[in-house]
């Protein structure tokens, strides 16, 4: 396997990421409904995990498409579980966590396409999910922040789906690395 950062293989990095995230994760509250669905994609069906907090209204709730971090090569639904349900609980929003394809096995634009298809799917299924289609936002950290920003820009450029808000947390969006 090719060496990644820190001279370790990608498999070793993924194993460490999983180990640490599993040890840090906490289970969601018993009152939160959590289930998984599949988003049909272009050559790949995207697994998503949906979190509905007890405080969310039955219809017209805000929705958040959450895209995990991990340098585009690590992370999954389990490693980002606490972050995703935390967003749901704190915002009283229905959160849809996206299990996009990882590099290097799936080079660009695979992850972007998975996230874009997930946003479109949430918009198309908003009524069934109990989400107000005018209140769908994006959230992501690190690589997920990058993907959230890219998905938001595409939605803007082609006229939708409309994005109500974006929580883009320490995104990898600038190559200059010259920050104040």
Label for each model-derived stretch:
Residues 78-98, 113:
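Short amphipathic alpha-helix adjacent to the substrate-entry channel of hydrolases
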Residues 1-53:
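A glycine/proline-hinged amphipathic helix-loop "lid/cap" segment
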Residues 107-120:
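Active-site loop/oxyanion-hole signature of alpha/beta-hydrolase fold enzymes
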